[in-house]
Each structure stands twice: as structure tokens, then as C-alpha cells.
């Protein structure tokens, strides 16, 4: 499946939620806590190729995702992804370890998904992370532009970086240990200068 997305930095979750509802978006479900683990081989083959292997625990669900390297589009983050649900996240973590994969990064967030009723071309994800809140718009490129405009954003606001990169950029260099973006962690606080 082709994933096409952009992130948007927001400052106020309550105001953004209100703006989403006023624009006709409806929550697809409850706000869910997500735990994410990224994996790579000791040789960092995946990182070097800009691919990604992630295990996500989202509420009661556990999902494995593999993402190909992003395409060269400068306006949207586009990449092929394959994912499947697994029964137990902890068992999958053990399997990855036994296969020789290393956990390279762990991050947490709260996510609420929104969609316009009877619209299947895209959805908005409201992410509350330790480095601040973001919207992710996922869908067709024209839908992303239209939804962003409805919410008061323009293509100049689009962020194509991963949460790992945003986290690393938000940490003072001397403090960054690089392995986790967790709520309540010393290393999950954004750099006030950033």
C-alpha cells in the first residue's frame, strides 16, 4: 500500500480538536495510547537504506509495519508500506530479538483519528507526543492539500520528517541519548531554542 502523508505542528490540542469538528471531521474512535518500537540489524541496513521496521502497540492491537525508503517527492512523504496485525506485541519483540534485530528507538504518543463522514480518500491523525502535538494528514495528495487548507494550513507548513528526526532535533546535543521518546523522560523534552 502506498502511504502519502505530511505532518503539521500544532500548539493547542483542544483548539485543534475544535477546529477539526467545525471543519466536518468526526473522531473514528477513542484517543488511544501507542507504544512504538523501531528495529534494525546490527549493521543498520534498514536505516542506511532509509527503510523502517516498526512494531506498534495501539490499545489492544499490535501491528508490524515495514516501510520502503521514501520517494523523492519534496512536498509529501510517500512510501510503500506493508503491515499486518499480530496477536501479542511482547512475543513479537522476542521474535525480533531472536532474529538478531536490535531495538533502535522507542516512542510513545496518544493518537486520535478523524475522518470526514462518507469520505474514504484520507484521514487526520491528532498525535500528542512528548515533543508536542502534531497533525498527520494521510491520503491522496489533493485531499491532503484540501484538508490542510480547511484547517488553516498551507504547503509551507508541511513537515516530512519522522518523529525520530523531530525528537533528535528537539534535544540538546549533549543530552541526546537517542533511544527513546517517552512521556516523563528526561530526553523527551523539546529544546526551548528549537
Question: What function would you assign to each model-found segment?
Answer:
Residues 57-59, 130, 141:
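A generic beta-sheet turn/junction motif
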Residues 124-131:
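A contiguous pocket-lining binding segment that forms or flanks enzyme active sites
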Residues 67-69, 129, 140:
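Surface loops and adjacent helix of pleckstrin homology
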Residues 145-159:
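Long, well-ordered alpha-helical scaffolding segments within enzyme catalytic domains
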Residues 27-28, 144-146:
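Short loop/beta submotifs within extracellular cysteine-rich repeat domains
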Residues 1-121, 157-194:
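N-terminal strand-loop-strand beta-hairpin
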Amino acid at each position: 500500500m502506498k502511504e502519502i502523508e505530511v505532518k503539521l505542528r500544532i500548539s493547542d490540542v483542544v483548539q485543534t480538536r475544535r477546529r477539526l469538528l467545525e471543519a466536518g471531521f468526526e473522531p473514528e474512535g477513542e484517543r488511544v495510547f501507542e507504544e512504538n518500537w523501531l528495529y534494525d540489524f546490527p549493521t543498520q541496513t534498514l536505516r542506511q537504506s532509509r527503510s523502517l521496521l516498526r512494531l506498534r502497540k495501539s490499545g489492544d492491537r499490535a501491528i508490524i509495519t515495514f516501510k520502503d525508503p521514501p520517494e523523492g517527492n519534496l512536498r509529501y512523504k510517500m512510501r510503500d508500506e506493508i503491515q499486518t496485525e499480530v496477536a501479542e506485541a511482547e512475543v513479537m519483540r522476542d521474535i525480533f530479538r531472536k532474529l538478531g534485530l536490535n531495538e533502535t528507538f522507542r516512542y510513545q504518543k496518544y493518537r486520535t483519528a478523524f475522518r470526514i463522514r462518507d469520505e474514504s480518500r484520507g484521514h487526520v491523525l491528532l498525535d500528542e507526543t512528548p515533543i508536542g502535538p502534531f497533525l498527520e494528514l494521510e491520503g491522496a495528495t489533493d485531499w491532503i492539500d484540501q484538508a490542510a487548507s480547511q484547517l488553516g494550513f498551507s504547503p509551507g507548513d508541511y513537515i516530512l520528517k519522522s518523529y525520530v528526526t523531530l525528537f533528535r532535533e528537539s534535544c540538546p546535543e549533549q543530552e541526546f541519548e537517542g533511544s527513546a521518546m517517552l512521556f516523563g523522560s528526561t530526553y523527551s523534552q523539546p529544546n526551548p531554542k528549537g
